[in-house]
């Protein structure tokens, strides 16, 4: 299925739940980010994902921190990898974004943080990511 057809089905909530997996979520987010500035893509994808979850009878499935964090990571990769890449090439170069479990978010968040009600309802900043200063200090001291 081409990108626009998948997005259209997603927006109409016509994709069957067993036919819309993590990789499809990433693909739709990737499409939004190629078409819209980051704030608009975040708003559109989030609103449509909420509607999709509601249509599937799972209104509590939407998770703000997971959704926002993935869009931020995808956007960063698009900027680094060039927005002109076709989906299959982008997916091949970014395999770590395509795996749901284990998730790339484990690099940035503690499990209990993502499991919190606060992280579900509003975006929470990463709590596992070390600052560049801390990494540089460890490197200078020879501690790894």
Regions found by a protein language model. Name each.
Residues 1-15:
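Intrinsically disordered, low-complexity serine/threonine- and proline-rich regulatory segments
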Residues 3-4, 19, 134-137:
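Short linear motifs in intrinsically disordered/low-complexity regions
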Residues 13-84:
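Conserved, aromatic- and glycine-enriched, well-ordered alpha/beta core segments
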Residues 4-7, 46, 71, 88:
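Hydrophobic core segments within long, regular secondary-structure runs in both alpha-
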Residues 63-144:
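A charged, amphipathic interaction segment
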């Amino acid at each position: 299925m081409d990108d626009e057809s998948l997005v259209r089905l997603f927006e109409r909530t016509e994709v069957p739940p067993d036919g819309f997996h993590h990789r499809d979520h990433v693909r739709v987010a990737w499409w939004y980010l190629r078409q819209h500035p980051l704030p608009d893509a975040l708003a559109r994808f989030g609103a449509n994902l909420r509607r999709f979850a509601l249509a599937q009878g799972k209104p509590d499935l939407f998770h703000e921190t997971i959704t926002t964090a993935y869009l931020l990571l995808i956007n960063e990769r698009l900027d680094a990898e060039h927005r002109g890449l076709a989906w299959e090439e982008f997916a091949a170069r970014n395999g770590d974004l395509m795996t749901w479990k284990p998730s790339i978010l484990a690099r940035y968040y503690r499990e209990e943080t993502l499991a919190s009600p606060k992280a579900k309802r509003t975006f929470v900043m990463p709590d596992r990511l070390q600052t560049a200063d801390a990494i540089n200090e460890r490197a200078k001291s020879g501690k790894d």
